[in-house]
């Protein structure tokens, strides 16, 4: 079974009407994932036994007709802990780690009878933009198997794009949901910082990380956010703001909506085909009644530098816990305690993770703190101020999600500076803690291109409203890669 042309609501109705059982649905989904795994390598762990056991239990008690997620199988990025299911963060360091508790988002999914179908491949510890730094090998883009799917949530994006999962969860620290969503032609959302609990998310940059949904349609995405959002006492950065119905504005027109298009987002370094797709999107939104004006986010160009100092500094602190003592890889043939630390971390971490730990440790050291980390934090404040000023006059901001379409596997993995610049359009959103969506907008040489829609803090509903209106006015989302239906 492929999920190319069916929504969660339609699939739910099939289960309610007993056109198929949850066990049949899950079994077919598992078969399809396993058939494509050798080509795509989008999963680290496939939860066959656990998923089928959960499916049989739901069939036995019956489907709740009022819960559209009951019995629906979804995929989970492998940095979100799942009790009894191996969680590796795509690292040798955690290659045999099985958590003894569930992340808050997993608890909320299971409270709605959602079935965890498996754990998806990713860049190691979410550090990367191509899913090439995984200890378990790179994931391949379903549109072209020689291209990257983006990252770090490349496995989640790939399984949804390939039609093998109707939905997935990812995490976004500097664009890790939105950029792969753009590269694979799906809908990916980074909610407002604090909208979703980070409890049980293996930390990279604690002031930047946010879990979010990845789906084929805007409405499915909003519906998934409905059941995972909300305050959690175990995450003090989670917001106590009331969780609205994120689907409430979907279907409403956008006439009169005022949208800004930053001139910096269509400047040098942006692929010409990407610019063309965005200009066509502007025309579509204008025809729908929105007013789109050129704006400026002058400090956004400093976002990448600020992000890699702040993110790497937070990562160097967060990853100190992986030392071979309590959990994770432990080196053999060691002479003393220091040897345990040094050898375990040297063997357990990949090159990109080591690079960021070293960068972060340097930025936080006594002699360089003021020149690097403190300065980056000041730049972050200026970027936030730029967004706040724009949102005094505009409802939304739009632009390309990524500067280019997906590129060839191996093309940039040894050139970190070039790879880091692929997130130049998404990083400022994380620094400011804003909600943002990537929605399919067009193609360049048969590879998907996404439109990024950025909203005010805790105004995901307006973002979904505009995204759904754009989706309904185009045919882009109805196209899909040529993957064989097993």
UniProtKB/Swiss-Prot annotation:
<keyword id="KW-0648">Protein biosynthesis</keyword>
<dbReference type="InterPro" id="IPR004412">
    <property type="entry name" value="GatA"/>
</dbReference>
<comment type="subunit">
    <text>Heterotrimer of A, B and C subunits.</text>
</comment>
<dbReference type="InterPro" id="IPR020556">
    <property type="entry name" value="Amidase_CS"/>
</dbReference>
<comment type="similarity">
    <text>Belongs to the amidase family. GatA subfamily.</text>
</comment>
<feature type="active site" description="Charge relay system">
    <location>
        <position position="152"/>
    </location>
</feature>
<dbReference type="InterPro" id="IPR000120">
    <property type="entry name" value="Amidase"/>
</dbReference>
<dbReference type="InterPro" id="IPR036928">
    <property type="entry name" value="AS_sf"/>
</dbReference>
<dbReference type="InterPro" id="IPR023631">
    <property type="entry name" value="Amidase_dom"/>
</dbReference>
<keyword id="KW-0547">Nucleotide-binding</keyword>
<keyword id="KW-0067">ATP-binding</keyword>
<feature type="active site" description="Acyl-ester intermediate">
    <location>
        <position position="176"/>
    </location>
</feature>
<dbReference type="GO" id="GO:0006412">
    <property type="term" value="P:translation"/>
</dbReference>
<dbReference type="GO" id="GO:0030956">
    <property type="term" value="C:glutamyl-tRNA(Gln) amidotransferase complex"/>
</dbReference>
<comment type="function">
    <text>Allows the formation of correctly charged Gln-tRNA(Gln) through the transamidation of misacylated Glu-tRNA(Gln) in organisms which lack glutaminyl-tRNA synthetase. The reaction takes place in the presence of glutamine and ATP through an activated gamma-phospho-Glu-tRNA(Gln).</text>
</comment>
<dbReference type="Pfam" id="PF01425">
    <property type="entry name" value="Amidase"/>
</dbReference>
<dbReference type="GO" id="GO:0050567">
    <property type="term" value="F:glutaminyl-tRNA synthase (glutamine-hydrolyzing) activity"/>
</dbReference>
<keyword id="KW-0436">Ligase</keyword>
<feature type="active site" description="Charge relay system">
    <location>
        <position position="77"/>
    </location>
</feature>
<protein>
    <recommendedName>
        <fullName>Glutamyl-tRNA(Gln) amidotransferase subunit A</fullName>
        <ecNumber>6.3.5.7</ecNumber>
    </recommendedName>
</protein>
<dbReference type="GO" id="GO:0005524">
    <property type="term" value="F:ATP binding"/>
</dbReference>
């Amino acid at each position: 079974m492929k999920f190319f042309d069916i929504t969660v609501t339609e699939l739910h109705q099939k289960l309610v009407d007993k056109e198929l059982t949850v066990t049949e649905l899950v079994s077919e989904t598992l078969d399809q994932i396993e058939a494509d795994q050798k080509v795509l390598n989008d999963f680290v762990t496939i939860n066959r036994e656990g998923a089928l056991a959960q499916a049989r239990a739901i069939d036995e008690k019956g489907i709740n007709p009022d819960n559209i997620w009951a019995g629906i199988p979804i995929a989970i990025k492998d940095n979100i802990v799942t009790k009894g299911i191996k969680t590796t963060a795509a690292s040798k360091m955690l290659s045999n780690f099985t958590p003894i508790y569930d992340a808050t988002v997993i608890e909320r999914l299971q409270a709605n009878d959602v079935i965890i179908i498996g754990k998806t491949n990713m860049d190691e510890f979410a550090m990367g933009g191509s899913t090439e730094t995984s200890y378990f090998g790179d994931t391949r883009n379903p549109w072209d198997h020689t291209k990257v799917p983006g990252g770090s949530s490349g496995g989640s994006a790939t399984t949804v794009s390939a039609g093998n999962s109707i939905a997935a969860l990812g995490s976004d620290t500097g664009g890790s949901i939105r950029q792969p969503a753009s590269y694979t032609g799906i809908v990916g959302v980074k909610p407002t910082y604090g909208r979703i609990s980070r409890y049980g998310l293996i930390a990279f940059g604690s002031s930047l990380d946010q879990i979010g949904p990845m789906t084929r349609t805007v409405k499915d995405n909003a519906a998934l956010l409905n059941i995972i959002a909300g305050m959690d006492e175990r995450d003090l950065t989670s917001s106590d703001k009331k969780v609205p119905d994120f689907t409430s504005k979907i279907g409403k027109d956008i006439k009169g909506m005022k949208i800004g298009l930053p001139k910096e987002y269509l400047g040098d370094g942006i692929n010409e085909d990407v610019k063309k797709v965005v200009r066509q999107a502007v025309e579509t939104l204008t025809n729908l009644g929105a007013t789109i004006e050129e704006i400026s986010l002058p400090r956004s160009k400093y976002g990448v530098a600020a992000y890699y100092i702040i993110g790497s500094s937070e990562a160097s602190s967060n990853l100190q816990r992986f030392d071979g003592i309590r959990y994770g890889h432990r080196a053999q043939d060691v002479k003393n305690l220091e040897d345990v630390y040094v050898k375990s971390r040297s063997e357990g971490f990949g090159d990109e993770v080591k690079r960021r730990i070293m960068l972060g440790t340097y930025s936080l050291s006594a002699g360089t703190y003021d020149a690097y980390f403190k300065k980056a934090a000041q730049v972050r404040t200026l970027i936030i101020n730029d967004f706040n000023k724009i949102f005094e006059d505009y409802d939304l901001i739009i632009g390309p999600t990524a500067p280019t379409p997906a590129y060839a596997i191996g093309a940039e993995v040894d050139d970190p500076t070039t790879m880091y610049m692929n997130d130049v359009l998404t990083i400022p959103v994380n620094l400011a803690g804003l909600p943002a969506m990537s929605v399919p907008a067009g193609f360049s040489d048969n590879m998907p291109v996404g439109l990024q829609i950025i909203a005010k803090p805790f105004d995901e509903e307006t973002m979904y409203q505009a995204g759904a209106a754009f989706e309904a006015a185009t045919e882009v989302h109805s196209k899909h890669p040529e993957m064989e239906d097993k």
